[in-house]
Every structure is written in C-alpha cells, then in structure tokens.
Regions:
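S-adenosyl-L-methionine-dependent methyltransferase catalytic core, i.e., the SAM/SAH-binding region
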Residues: 1-311
Length: 311
C-alpha cells in the first residue's frame, strides 16, 4: 500500500530550519517524504538524511526522493539511533534537524495497523511493524497497576483506575484481541454522564497511552535532542513538532535547559559551574497551524512547532 501522509505545517517547518543550500540536514521522521522533499528542493550541494522506522514509509520516500540522487540518504531507523546513523555515515556535523512526532495519517487510516478505535483490527499500534512488542502485549500482560499508570500518565485519563479494572476483568474471560473490543471495554468503564460531556471518543486517551507505551515515544525524544544539539554546527536549527502536551513539555523543557548559561544556585555570588548556553530558543511560544491548514487537515489542530538555534 502506498504510504500517504499530510505534511503538517510544511512551510513553517522548512522556514524554521533556515536552510543553507550546502548544509547537511536530518529529517528524523520522514513519513511520506513531504518535509524531506521540501528540504531537498532548497539544497544545492547539501545533503539530507531521512529516517523512518516504517517499511512502507521508507519505500515511499525512496520513490519520491529518487530525483535528488546522492543528495538524499534514506535510512530505516528510529530517530533515537541518530548518533549511530551519523557515525555509520561518517557525518560529524549537521546544520539542522526536523522531528515530526505525530503518528502518520497513513498509520492512523490503515485499519490493519491497529491504531484506530473506529475500525476493527488486531491490536497492534507498532510504528515499526517488525517490533516484537505490540498493543496486544500491553493490554493482555500488564498488571492492573501498570495499566492504570500508563493510562493516567500517558493518556492523562482521569478514569484510568476504572479502565484498567475493566480491561483486567475482560481479559480474565478471554484475551482482548481487537481494537473495537478494547474500545468497547473502555467506553463501558467511563461513567455515562462524563462520556456525554466529552467531544472526543471515550477511548482516545487510552489508545494514545497504549500507543506511546508500545513505541516508547516519550523515551526517545530527549536522547535525540541531545544528539542533534551535540552534532549541530553553530547557527544550526532544530525544529520539533509535537501533537500532545506530554511531548511538548519534554521539548520545551529540554530547549530551556540548553538555553541556560549559569546553573549555579541563586545564592552563589559568582558563577562556578562554567556552564554555557548551547541553544537560543527562537519560538518563545510554539507555532501553530493557520486556519487555512486547519480547514484542509483537522489533525493539524493539536500540532505545536518549537524551534531553537545552536549558539
């Protein structure tokens, strides 16, 4: 199946990178190749490394970016392995990094991938289809306490205890195998009055939590930022697009940490730490999609783009 993905805030992302025609850039989440293509179109002698862990995305990118020849380097990898990828390519310094942390529209809209609570499929939710660990394993093997924790922490779901209890009770009868089966269990766990007040599907937050757990989505952000900052040339830009508050909080905090100079306690009369700021935060407030884009793609509504520059 052809991998399709709407490139959220395409112009904003490309402008944020302040691309140098001879620079070396990394698109950490290539998806359908939209952002990668736009970056390559601004390069002359420069190169772009496009990463993705999805086989279908890789094949789509190879076709879409073939016209750029050797300037396009496509690697099947999670961006948490950015350090290893750069080492294997013998690339020491880079000029910019783009990360789109959203689940691709292709993955969401392909029922067999098991991401959607609106279509019936086997419980899966793996961004890397070759990973041995899926949503089925989380739902059917995690303890009630573990389920409650991830649903509350990653889904910010206030009914996490009730949902975890219902899941455990249901799987005692039979393993929970499909997305609609799980969605029904979640719906029945939430009080009717509370569900009626919600504008979104009652399973949305729990599905998000399980997806994050399956793909270790939050765990990989910090090391990727650290690698990007350490490898970027002065003046290089890092642009990260997030789609929920947990991701955004990590990115904002990490940027601000790198933007700090002295980290000594406030009561120290002089600086003894010797720490120097490594980043200048370009976006004091995140960039969000404009109304025109929101009309084209409702999923852009939750996107936040934060940009920083190496100093």
């Amino acid at each position: 199946m052809e991998f399709s993905h709407y490139s959220v805030m395409l112009k904003e992302c490309i402008d944020a990178l302040d691309i140098k025609p001879n620079g070396i850039y990394v698109d950490c989440t290539a998806g359908g190749g939209g952002h990668s293509e736009a970056i390559l179109e601004r390069l002359d002698s420069g190169k772009l490394i496009s990463l993705d862990q999805d086989d279908e995305a890789i094949e789509t990118c190879k076709k879409r970016l073939a016209r750029f020849g050797e300037r396009s380097i496509i690697v099947k990898s999670n961006f948490s392995e950015l350090e290893r990828v750069l080492n294997e390519l013998e690339i020491v310094h880079i000029d910019g990094v783009l990360m789109d942390l959203g689940v691709s529209s292709h993955q969401l809209d392909t029922p067999s991938r098991g991401f959607s609570y609106n279509s019936d499929a086997e419980l899966d939710m793996r961004m890397n289809p070759r990973s041995p660990f899926s949503a089925y394993d989380v739902v059917n093997t995690y303890s009630e306490q573990e389920l409650k924790k991830i649903i509350f922490d990653y889904g910010e779901e206030r009914f996490a205890p009730q949902i975890a209890r219902k899941i455990v009770l249901a799987r005692e009868e039979n393993p929970i195998k499909t997305t609609l089966e799980l969605a029904s269990i979640i719906k029945n766990a939430i009080p009717v009055g509370a569900a009626k007040k919600e504008s979104q599907h009652p399973a949305k937050r729990t599905f998000q939590a399980i997806r994050i757990e399956v793909n270790h989505e939050l765990d990989v952000i910090t090391p990727a930022i650290e690698t990007a900052v350490s490898r970027m040339n002065i003046g290089g830009r890092i642009a990260i697009m997030t789609f929920h508050s947990l991701e955004d909080r990590i990115v904002k905090t990490k940027y601000n940490d790198y933007a700090k100079a002295c980290t000594c306690p406030a009561n120290f009369p002089v600086c003894v730490c010797g720490n120097k700021a490594k980043l200048k935060v370009i976006t004091k407030k995140p960039i969000i999609a404009n109304n025109e884009e929101l009309n084209e793609n409702a999923r852009s509504r939750s996107a936040k783009l934060r940009v920083a520059e190496k100093i």
